[in-house]
């Protein structure tokens, strides 16, 4: 499988992250105790040269399955994890969760669930237009500075806010 390069930062230095050109989405790994299903799928994708897995805290047991699989295979150093946060919780689906505090919480929970100390890519799964872009980007940058995240992204944002975030990030 071919690779593409994503730029990131690690320990204050620019890095290049070589990601397979096909991302394995892990939304199907939502069930608890799903390693009988998830393990062979993850193994096959990895054997084909795939190395990047897309997951999210909101995907319930997906992060747990990927973390357990990496732990069983001892392959964390060969895996690229893209996870997402900032999604409303199921119990309060109408309450936005894109705040500096929720970003930190989601990354912390994801790292624990994935059994790792960092993710290569972290994206916000939603937006909260009631929160200014600046504090959101500052929170994301802090996670990069702290080494918990190497590159950041956005999902489901309106174009003007994406432009503002990009200008803030440059």
Give the role of each language-model region.
Residues 1-80:
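N-terminal binding-site loop/beta-alpha segment at the start of enzyme catalytic domains
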Residues 14-21, 51-61, 86-95, 111-114, ...:
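Short charge-dense sequence patches
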Residues 20-21, 74-79, 83, 117-121, ...:
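Short acidic capping loops at alpha-helix termini that bridge into adjacent secondary structure
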Residues 27-29, 56-58, 84-88, 124-127, ...:
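Active-site beta-loop-alpha junctions enriched in small/polar residues
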Residues 30-33, 90-93, 131:
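A generic structural signal for short coil/turn motifs at secondary-structure boundaries
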Residues 43, 47, 94-170:
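Glycine/proline-rich, positively charged
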Residues 70, 83-85, 89, 107, ...:
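Generic hydrophobic/packing signal
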Residues 73-101:
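Structural motif corresponding to the early beta-alpha repeats
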């Amino acid at each position: 499988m071919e690779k593409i390069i994503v730029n990131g930062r690690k320990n204050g230095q620019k890095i290049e992250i070589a990601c397979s050109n096909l991302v394995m989405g892990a939304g199907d790994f939502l069930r608890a105790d799903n390693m009988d299903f998830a393990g062979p799928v993850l193994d096959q994708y990895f054997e084909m040269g795939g190395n990047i897995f897309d997951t999210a805290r909101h995907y319930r047991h997906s992060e747990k399955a990927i973390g357990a699989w990496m732990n069983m295979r001892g392959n964390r150093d060969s895996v690229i994890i893209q996870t997402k946060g900032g999604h409303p919780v199921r119990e309060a689906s109408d309450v936005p969760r894109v705040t500096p505090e929720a970003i930190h919480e989601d990354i912390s929970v994801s790292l624990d669930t994935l059994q790792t100390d960092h993710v290569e890519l972290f994206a916000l799964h939603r937006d909260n237009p009631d929160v200014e872009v600046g504090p959101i980007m500052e929170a994301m940058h802090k996670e990069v500075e702290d080494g918990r995240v190497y590159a950041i992204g956005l999902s489901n944002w309106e174009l003007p806010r994406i432009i503002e975030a990009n200008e803030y990030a440059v």
